[in-house]
Each structure stands twice: as structure tokens, then as C-alpha cells.
Amino acid sequence: SALPARSEMCIRDRHCFSSPLKVAEEALERGYVLSFAGNVTFKRNAELRQAAAKAPAGQLLVETDAPYMTPEPYRGQRNEPALIGHTYECIARVRHQTVQALAAEVNDTFDRVYGLR
């Protein structure tokens, strides 16, 4: 398994998640938070979008991974925080949410996971 066996990890955030759907399902079952970057927007990453769609509220984050993982339609260029809206739009679409609802959900998850509340 690609997941650490130790269940006492403090922060269970799978940064820049890019593993197969089966790993996503196992990680979610174990209580991990999956963090998605611009690679979720790549045409060939339908399985990654499925993982984002399956992540329940409270187990999903969105990140830039700048200067890497630039979202479509800017793939191949240097990534920067200003482009994160494309990643949010892609994930919101597959989750059947508005971008605003997804952003609020991600904000709540971030605050909880990183102890800001």
C-alpha cells in the first residue's frame, strides 16, 4: 500500500494527490484528506476527477502546487496562485457544486485539518 501504516499521524493530508482511484478510496476510508492540484484538470486524468468527486465534505482540499501542476488551459506554463480558480471550477463541476460552495467546504476543511479553529 502507498499509505503509511501508522494511524497516529497528526496531519493526514495527501498533498498533490495523483494516485489511482483505488488508493483514493483506501485513503478516504482511513480518514485521509486528499488535496488536489492543477493536474486534476488534465484531460487524461478522468480517474483523478473521480477521486475528487468521491471525497466527502471534510476530506478534500485544493492547492496550487505552484510553480508546478499548472491547470488547463495554461498547462506547460509556470503555475501561480492566480490560476487556482481553474482547479476549483473543474472540481466543483465533477462534484455538482458551485465554486463558492466548494471554496467554503475547502476553507472549513483547511481550518480543521491545520488547527485554525
Predicted region positions:
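Single conserved hydrophobic/aromatic residue that forms the stacking wall/gate
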Residues: 1-5, 10-11
